[in-house]
């Protein structure tokens, strides 16, 4: 009977959408609503039902035959065991990719640059690469569910959940089973749930004494497992669709020296309401390690911060507001923005990890009403990394909050130098931008001292200068953006190659830009090996780092210059870093004098 029992049973898998409190009555669980899809990361509770065809078919026979069949079925059903496993059914890429990979690169960082912003605490690597405005989609890294809401919770709350032990009825046996979908790839589209059913029997004394290895070495496998051929063994499987977690997009920006991160959570895959319980941004120091080597050793990434005192687990503070309270319910295609501000810990300069990348990860805790056996799901997303680049040379400005039109007032500019010694520091008022249209608002500002020479500036010192202004019309005006910094500092100039042609005005081209470069280079050599740095706020059209721009011009060889004798210019290795210098905005409100 046992030999053919597998084929004499019907197998059913039920995925109830609500908890089950009683399995004694088959009519109850058969009429419960069933789930048509699952969520990646949840714990799935389902039922496997084995229904005996012979037990139901023997009711037309004699009473003795029916009792014998029922007794045999109960003996067999009581000795059966079942275990469930899960595997990806389909992990191919979706038609419209939901995730895009941005792994710790400079292009990951999203800065919506604004001419009034100044870089203060953090920056982005790879400033020479392309810039992207708006939100960028973040890739899920890891998905897991609440560990305190697993099988143990079913035992603690038997009233709301099915029992763990199999239930044997007159013609069927019910196995309550559990599988977790938190060990699957993040791009899984379908899952295959496999259940193996077998009859548990005690091992022979010979096997318990010697073990299978010794017996297989002495006997043939067919002889050893001959009796196991009559043991009940069956395997059933089903495939279900899997919905991905909510979509998370990220935008990073720096406003007035404060680093802000906006996370956009979108319910773009489920027609059910998604409850966002918590959102966090944490440093991901696990990204500092490379994959394990064959010998078991682990290497560190050089440019990635392995531990940081500045960026701690609580450094990203979520700014709560009326529109972003938690928990938050998101309907289908509904999104919610969450604003985070980076709060760095004060660290000595020697202990600072400045210049190193700090990988970030976002942790989203969410759930739906269709998760009857999972309290919540935690999804980890990869965020663009940040780099600790505090400016060491800062220009601040202060002025009256409000003045009248055509009224003379003064703006006090203060320079805080913690960068290096400078031979000369000058402030130049440059309202016109290079190659840009004139701004009528800027033309209304009259600077009475467009050039201020502050002289030598030692590292650790503070310089101040007062500049007189007059504004001709009413409005709100910014007085730091167009105040250009000119810094002169010593620089080591390497020896020119022997075949390099010296720079001279005799063979210089007629291009004014080239001649200006040559003149400034000759002047720098005569001033004791110094270089000049011009710091100018970028316009909105420049997709460059907020707060600093270096002017670079190409030098064209003169017409008719000898082939193979290039122009020699000193390398730019000593050019100041753009992230080390910043300017703070200063705005004044101009009121109409007639009012």
UniProtKB/Swiss-Prot annotation:
Biological-process GO terms, alphabetical: cilium assembly; regulation of cell population proliferation
One Gene Ontology CC term in the entry: TRAPPII protein complex
The keyword Cytoplasm appears for this protein: yes
Entry superkingdom: Eukaryota
Chief site of localization: cytoplasm
Keywords tagged on the record: Cilium biogenesis/degradation, Cytoplasm, Cytoskeleton
Keyword Lipid biosynthesis: no
GO MF, one example: alpha-tubulin binding
Region annotation Disordered: where it falls in the sequence: 84-111, 494-513
Deletion phenotype: Morpholino knockdown of the protein in early embryos results in curved bodies and small eyes. Morphants exhibit reduced ciliation in otic vesicles, neuromasts, and olfactory placodes. In a knockout model mutant animals show head to body ratios lower than those of controls. They have decreased brain cell proliferation rate at 24 hpf.
A Pfam family per the record: TRAPP14_C
InterPro entries, alphabetized: TRAPP14_C, TRAPP14_N, TRAPPC14
Subcellular location: Cytoplasm, Cytoskeleton, Spindle; Vesicle; Midbody
Subunit (UniProt): Component of the multisubunit TRAPP II complex, which includes at least TRAPPC1, TRAPPC2, TRAPPC2L, TRAPPC3, TRAPPC4, TRAPPC5, TRAPPC6A/B, TRAPPC9, TRAPPC10 and TRAPPC14. TRAPPC9, TRAPPC10 and TRAPPC14 are specific subunits of the TRAPP II complex. Interacts with alpha-tubulin during mitosis.
Function: Specific subunit of the TRAPP (transport protein particle) II complex, a highly conserved vesicle tethering complex that functions in late Golgi trafficking as a membrane tether. TRAPP II complex also has GEF activity toward RAB1A. TRAPPC14 is required for ciliogenesis.
Protein name: Trafficking protein particle complex subunit 14
Organism: Danio rerio
Source taxonomy: Eukaryota, Metazoa, Chordata, Craniata, Vertebrata
């Amino acid at each position: 009977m046992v030999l053919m029992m597998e084929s004499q049973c019907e197998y059913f898998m039920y995925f109830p959408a609500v908890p089950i409190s009683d399995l004694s009555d088959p009519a109850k669980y058969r009429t419960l609503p069933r789930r048509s899809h699952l969520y990646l990361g949840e714990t799935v509770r389902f039922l496997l039902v084995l229904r005996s065809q012979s037990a139901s078919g023997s009711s037309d026979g004699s009473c003795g035959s029916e009792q014998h069949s029922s007794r045999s079925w109960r003996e067999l059903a009581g000795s059966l065991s079942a275990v469930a496993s899960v595997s990806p059914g389909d992990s191919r890429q979706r038609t419209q990719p939901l995730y895009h990979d941005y792994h710790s690169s400079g292009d990951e960082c999203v800065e919506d640059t604004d001419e009034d912003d100044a870089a203060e605490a953090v920056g982005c690597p790879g400033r020479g690469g392309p810039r992207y405005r708006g939100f960028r989609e973040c890739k899920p890294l890891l998905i897991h569910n609440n560990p305190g809401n697993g099988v143990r919770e079913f035992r603690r709350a038997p009233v709301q959940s099915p029992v763990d032990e199999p239930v044997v009825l007159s013609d069927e046996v019910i196995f309550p089973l559990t599988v977790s979908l938190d060990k699957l790839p993040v791009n899984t589209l379908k899952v295959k749930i496999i259940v193996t059913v077998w009859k548990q029997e005690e091992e022979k004394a010979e096997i318990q004494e010697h073990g299978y290895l010794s017996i297989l070495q002495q006997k043939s496998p067919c002889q050893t497992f001959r009796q196991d051929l009559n043991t009940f063994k069956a395997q059933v499987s089903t495939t279900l669709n899997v919905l991905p977690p909510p979509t998370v997009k990220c935008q990073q920006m720096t406003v007035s020296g404060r680093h802000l991160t906006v996370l956009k959570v979108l319910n773009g895959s489920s027609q059910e309401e998604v409850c966002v319980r918590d959102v966090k941004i944490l440093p991901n120091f696990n990204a500092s390690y490379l994959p394990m080597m064959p010998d078991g050793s682990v290497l560190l990434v050089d440019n990635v911060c392995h531990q940081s005192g500045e960026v701690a687990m609580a450094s990203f503070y979520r700014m709560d507001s009326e529109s972003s309270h938690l928990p938050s319910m998101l309907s289908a295609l509904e999104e919610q923005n969450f604003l985070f501000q980076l709060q760095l810990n004060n660290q000595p300069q020697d202990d600072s990890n400045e210049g190193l990348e700090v990988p970030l990860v976002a942790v989203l805790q969410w759930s739906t009403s269709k998760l009857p056996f999972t309290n919540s799901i935690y999804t980890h997303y990869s965020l663009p990394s940040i780099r600790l680049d505090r400016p060491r040379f800062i220009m601040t400005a202060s002025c009256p909050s409000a003045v009248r039109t055509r009224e003379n007032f003064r703006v006090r500019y203060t320079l805080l130098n913690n960068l290096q010694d400078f031979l000369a520091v000058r402030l130049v008022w440059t309202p016109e931008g290079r190659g840009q249209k004139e701004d009528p608002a800027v033309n209304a500002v009259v600077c009475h001292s467009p050039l201020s020479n502050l002289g030598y500036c030692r590292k650790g010192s503070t310089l101040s200068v007062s500049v007189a202004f007059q504004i001709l019309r009413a409005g709100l005006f910014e007085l730091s953006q167009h105040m250009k910094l000119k810094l002169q500092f010593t620089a080591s100039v390497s020896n020119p190659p022997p075949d390099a042609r010296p720079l001279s005005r005799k063979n210089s081209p007629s291009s004014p830009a080239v001649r200006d470069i040559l003149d400034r280079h000759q002047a720098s050599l005569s001033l004791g090996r110094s270089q000049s740095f011009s710091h100018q706020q970028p316009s909105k059209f420049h997709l460059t780092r907020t707060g600093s721009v270096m002017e670079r011009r190409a030098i064209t060889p003169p017409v008719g210059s000898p082939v193979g004798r290039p122009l020699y210019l000193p390398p730019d290795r000593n050019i100041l870093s753009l992230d080390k210098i910043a300017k703070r905005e200063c705005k004044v409100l101009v009121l109409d004098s007639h009012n």
